[in-house]
Regions:
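Glycine-rich beta-strand-to-loop/alpha-helix junction loops that act as flexible
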Residues: 42-47, 131-135, 195
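ATP/nucleoside-binding phosphotransfer catalytic cores, i.e., glycine-rich phosphate-binding loops
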Residues: 180-182, 186-235
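Ligand-binding beta-strand-loop-alpha-helix segment within the catalytic cores
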Residues: 2-4, 63-130
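Short, conserved loop/helix-junction motifs that constitute active-site signature segments
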Residues: 58-66, 152-154, 182-187, 221-225
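Class I SAM-dependent methyltransferase SAM-binding "motif I" and its flanking Rossmann-like core
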Residues: 135-182
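N-terminal glycine-/serine-/threonine-rich phosphate-binding loop
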Residues: 1-40
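Glycine-rich N-terminal segment of FAD-binding domains in flavoprotein oxidoreductases
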Residues: 29-57
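A glycine- and small-aliphatic-rich helix-loop capping segment at beta-alpha/alpha-beta transitions
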Residues: 54-62, 85-89, 144-153, 208-209
Length: 235
């Protein structure tokens, strides 16, 4: 399990946004001070979007920051479901380097291999991996399904794989590419942002179960060697 897990609870969305923006800004600035560059993995979706938009306003040397999605849907980059498109729209105007992890490969497993090769060219490990979680316990795009074990136990040198969630999520019924649990586990810092009592209950159970968890998020957290801050917006 993660070396240490600390919960931060918020009653108001604005307070959570401010806290995450402040902490992520500090992480990025610390990486820039230490190494002259920063590599971060951000999630897509509706929950992180307002946080990312506010983060982009921070006085950070964005030209020295490389951003990758923690996961993405296998759709064209101009599709509304594309995580990298959302991230790029927010951060490219600030000068950040935003790299897609998807490709034109028709087969999701080939797309995963292409993503893994692309990530091999980056200065690793990431300075930050920012995770979310669904009500099925998935994190990044490590979903319950036939590819879950590959994403969770695919080898220390495998940074990304293709996955076919089963069942496909109704809000985005497409295959995906995701960072693996081992890649997430190498991060210098890690945070997880959720909202609502239902997700909190699931996450607490997943953490308690650890490496034996039926929830992907529990097993991912088990592989993270650094402390993890969890930001939770209460109902």
């Amino acid at each position: 399990m993660a070396e240490e897990i600390e919960w931060w609870d918020f009653d108001a969305a604005e307070d959570l946004i401010d806290a995450v923006v402040g902490d992520v800004s500090f992480i990025i600035e610390s990486a820039l001070d230490a190494r002259g560059q920063a590599l971060v993995a951000f999630p897509g979706g509706s929950t992180p979007k307002p946080i990312l938009e506010k983060l982009a306003q921070a006085n950070i040397r964005w030209k020295s920051v490389t951003i990758i999605p923690t996961d993405d849907r296998l759709v064209p980059v101009d599709n509304a479901l594309s995580n990298v498109a959302m991230i790029a729209k927010i951060f490219i105007p600030k000068g950040a380097r935003v790299l897609p992890i998807t490709s034109d490969a028709a087969d999701y497993k080939l797309a995963g291999g292409a993503a893994n090769a692309r990530l091999a060219d980056l200065h690793w490990p990431p300075d930050l991996v920012w995770l979310g979680m669904g009500t099925d316990g998935h994190t990044a795009s490590i979903f319950p399904g036939p590819d879950m074990e590959t994403a969770l136990e695919g080898g220390k040198d495998v940074r990304a794989v293709g996955v076919a969630p089963d069942p496909l999520p109704p809000e985005a019924p497409v295959n995906r590419v995701t960072l693996t649990a081992s890649a997430i586990g190498t991060a210098r810092t890690a945070i997880l942002v959720i909202n609502g009592a239902e997700k909190r209950e699931i996450l607490e159970a997943a953490i308690e179960q650890g490496s034996k968890s039926a929830y992907p998020v529990g097993r991912v957290l088990d592989k993270i060697a650094v402390p993890v801050d969890i930001y939770c917006l209460d109902d």
